[in-house]
């Protein structure tokens, strides 16, 4: 029984940890009612940021079935951020990707992916990043649904 407890504890601990990305700092942002994951490579604090906004991720299993977790299945946007030579690059996940929140439910990565509270959370995250790195401005690069989020911000 104590081994079962240990296995469960190891599993839940690993689910809550974010992977490391070479050359990037791992960030957890509390934005609105959501937890957002971000990775940042900042070499010139006080200068503008370039923020890559993740797409819709794994929103659907098939045409009719929403996934239980919208975390992207591939690293396309993260790879774009990693290959960018700009001095201050941030990869910003969408709400409910990588990190759970009590408010996460399929609505937020399906029909509600551009709901006011989602856009407000992304705006809050961008503001936090700009403040943290003393950035006078931020350039948003959105991929797929992240492009719509960037445009709405």
Which residues are covered by each model-predicted region?
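Alpha/beta-hydrolase active-site loop
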Residues: 105-132
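Short, surface-exposed "cap/lid" segments of acyl-processing enzymes
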Residues: 43-93, 98-99
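Sec-dependent N-terminal signal peptides
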Residues: 3-12
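Gly/Ala-rich beta-loop-alpha elbow adjacent to hydrolase catalytic centers
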Residues: 140-146, 150
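Aromatic pocket-lining residues of Rossmann-like dinucleotide-binding sites
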Residues: 153
